[in-house]
């Protein structure tokens, strides 16, 4: 974090913005990192890499979330597979672990985040879920809504359905499942992709997505493409337009206010 904020970002001439890492296994150190680096220029927020054995709703993290929220920054959870996890040791193919792992951990943490009322406790804290694909989102929306309607007393902090909270959060595209275009279109509709989804490439990994993955989707409007490919990120992270063309596009689609 020190290297990024003292060397990389200052030397980038405004071209780089960064999410800083949180040492999530140590809540007190996580808070110190936010307090020390959270106000540095071109820092957009803080990122938690896959948490495997700690609940994101545990009380030890409340001061961390509050500190990020007070600074107007973004909290993100970046998922990833772990073949060393006992349950995943039953998988005998990388394909299986890769398919399940990236989605599974964010499913787990998103469930704990929503059901434990974190969206109500930190209503001004934008939350971003990274590198889990998109297919898990409508699945989890439906499952949590179903369970919540049967047992609302177990989620006393909620003031609306779990899916409504999930539609208020943000998601990265990669790796986007494009095999069934109708299913993908339904996913985009359910998650309010036009305002909540942000393109990510994951380059140079072997399964990276080109910008054309979004631009070539036949069911997206021009505004939706603009938002997903950069407009939403400009609004969320308060990115400054670097030239008049960028400024015109942000203004055209309603994303300039926070960016300029």
Where are these regions (language model features)?
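Active-site gating/metal-coordination segments in enzymes
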Residues: 1-109
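Mid-to-C-terminal alpha-helical segments outside catalytic/metal-binding sites
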Residues: 2-10, 32-35, 116-117, 125-126, ...
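Hydrophobic faces of well-ordered beta-strands that scaffold small-molecule active sites
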Residues: 17-20, 44-48, 75-77, 127-129, ...
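Aromatic-lined glycan-binding groove of carbohydrate-active enzymes
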Residues: 79-83, 114-168
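Short secondary-structure boundary/capping segments
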Residues: 92, 143-146, 213-215
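Aromatic-anchored helix/helix-loop segment that forms the rim or "lid"
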Residues: 101-108, 153-183
């Amino acid at each position: 974090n020190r290297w990024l904020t003292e060397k990389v970002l200052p030397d980038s001439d405004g071209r780089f913005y960064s999410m800083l890492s949180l040492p999530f296994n140590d809540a007190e150190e996580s808070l110190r990192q936010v307090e020390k680096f959270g106000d540095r220029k071109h820092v957009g927020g803080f990122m938690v890499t896959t948490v495997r054995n700690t609940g994101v709703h545990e009380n030890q993290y409340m001061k961390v979330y509050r500190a990020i929220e007070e600074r107007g920054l973004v909290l993100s959870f970046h998922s990833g597979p772990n073949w060393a996890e006992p349950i995943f040791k039953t998988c005998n193919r990388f394909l299986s672990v890769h398919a399940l792992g990236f989605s599974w951990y964010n499913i787990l943490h998103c469930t704990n985040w929503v059901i434990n009322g974190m969206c109500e406790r930190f209503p001004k804290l934008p939350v971003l879920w990274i590198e889990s694909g998109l297919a898990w989102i409508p699945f989890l929306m439906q499952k949590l809504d179903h369970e919540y309607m049967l047992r609302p007393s177990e989620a006393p902090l909620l003031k609306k359905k779990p899916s409504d909270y999930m539609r208020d959060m943000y998601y990265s595209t990669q790796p986007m499942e494009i095999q069934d275009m109708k299913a993908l279109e339904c996913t985009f509709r359910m998650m309010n992709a036009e305002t909540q989804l942000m393109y990510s490439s994951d380059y140079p990994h072997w399964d990276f997505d080109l910008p054309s993955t979004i631009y070539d989707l036949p069911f997206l409007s021009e505004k939706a493409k603009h938002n997903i490919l950069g407009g939403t990120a400009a609004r969320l992270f308060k990115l400054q337009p670097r030239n008049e063309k960028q400024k015109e596009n942000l203004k055209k689609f309603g994303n300039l206010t926070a960016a300029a």
